């Protein structure tokens, strides 16, 4: 789907920007082919080095391709807006507006601006995330867990772009927060165990008194799901696959449940099953659910979950694009939501998939939640 959309937008850019240039056909032709190749670079690279999910080419090459691809998308979108405006000017018979919109330098200038903005976006996508602190009120939280601190990492996407050096910085920043518990809500890695072993090794240094609990996202399935599960556990993580664990303090309990990702269906693996995950759990203990995708929040709330932590959306990547991502994820894209008595938090994520690695106005994050007790009003 991404390649088809990219190809259509590339053809549009060639038609509206490259072809009108006052250059010889011998120059416009290669330029046009270069733009089309850029739109299809995911498939081209995957044919020779790695996969669509995990391009195994040098970091600098990924960054250059990501910058060009993002610029292509931004340029195409602005061109569409300009052409709609030009059509409106024609219909309204506004010659001055038509003249302004037809200036020969306008579209190439937009292209240059798109390239510069994209370079900035890729630099932000590769930046070490900053820490965001969030207080969460949970009804009748046991007093033993008042002030309990949970650090969430999600969408780390360790890869040839976000290497072990970057992961180590994320881990160091996380450990500096001194949380009580670390949870990782999927998409830890892009690629095979052999390709990413060194890049994920720093995750073994994550530490918290109550440990590190992880679930899978969709990208673990694109790599080697069966091999990654024991690899994560060797790094000291407790991986929840439609299961739960219990945190105990002074006789009180907190249930941490985790479900798999729906993409499991493609691979004949277990689909998300919250009922199974909560089987045997104390019904009086508050439930924190780790669910990579936020779109099942309403169904999860109906089953008594107090707090759902998700990722997957990357916050929408770019301001404005978040509205499209929101529609594809049940109306949830970034930050906190009150969902039928449950709190849902959708993290922007720490990293990004190398195939679309831009962040413009949507910063990455490491999230630290402080749990607070909320007493239910009488009569509820």
Regions found by a protein language model. Give the residues of each.
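Soluble catalytic domains of enzymes that build or remodel membrane lipids, polysaccharides, and related
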Residues: 132, 137-380
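Non-catalytic terminal accessory segments
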Residues: 1-127, 376-378
């Amino acid at each position: 789907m991404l390649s088809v959309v990219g190809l259509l937008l590339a053809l549009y850019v060639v038609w509206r920007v490259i072809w009108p240039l006052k250059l010889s056909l011998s120059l416009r032709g290669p330029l046009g082919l270069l733009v089309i190749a850029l739109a299809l670079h995911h498939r081209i690279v995957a044919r020779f080095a790695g996969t669509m999910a995990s391009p195994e080419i040098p970091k600098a090459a990924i960054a250059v391709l990501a910058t060009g691809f993002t610029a292509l998308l931004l340029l195409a979108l602005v061109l569409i807006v300009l052409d709609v405006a030009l059509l409106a000017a024609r219909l309204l018979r506004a010659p001055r507006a038509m003249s302004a919109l037809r200036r020969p330098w306008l579209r190439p200038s937009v292209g240059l601006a798109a390239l510069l903005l994209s370079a900035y976006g890729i630099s932000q996508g590769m930046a070490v995330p900053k820490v965001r602190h969030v207080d969460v009120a949970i009804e009748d939280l046991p007093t033993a867990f008042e002030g309990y601190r949970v650090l969430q990492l999600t969408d780390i996407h360790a890869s040839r772009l976000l290497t072990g050096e970057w992961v180590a910085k994320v881990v160091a920043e996380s450990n500096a927060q001194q949380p009580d518990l670390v949870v990782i809500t999927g998409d830890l890695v892009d690629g095979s165990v052999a390709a990413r072993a060194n890049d994920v090794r720093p995750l073994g240094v994550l530490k918290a008194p109550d440990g590190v609990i992880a679930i899978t996202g969709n990208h673990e399935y694109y790599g080697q799901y069966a091999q990654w599960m024991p690899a994560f556990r060797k790094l000291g993580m407790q991986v929840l696959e439609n299961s739960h664990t219990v945190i105990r303090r002074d006789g009180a309990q907190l249930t941490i449940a985790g479900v798999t990702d729906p993409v499991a269906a493609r691979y004949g693996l277990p689909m998300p099953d919250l009922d199974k995950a909560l089987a045997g759990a104390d019904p009086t203990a508050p439930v924190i659910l780790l669910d990579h995708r936020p779109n099942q929040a309403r169904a999860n709330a109906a089953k008594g979950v107090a707090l759902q932590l998700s990722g997957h959306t990357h916050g929408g990547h770019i301001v404005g694009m978040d509205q499209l991502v929101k529609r594809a994820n049940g109306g949830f894209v970034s930050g906190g939501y009150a969902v039928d008595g449950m709190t849902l938090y959708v993290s922007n994520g720490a990293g990004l998939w190398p195939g679309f690695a831009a962040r413009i106005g949507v910063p990455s994050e490491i999230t630290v939640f402080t749990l607070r007790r909320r007493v239910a009003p009488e009569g509820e």
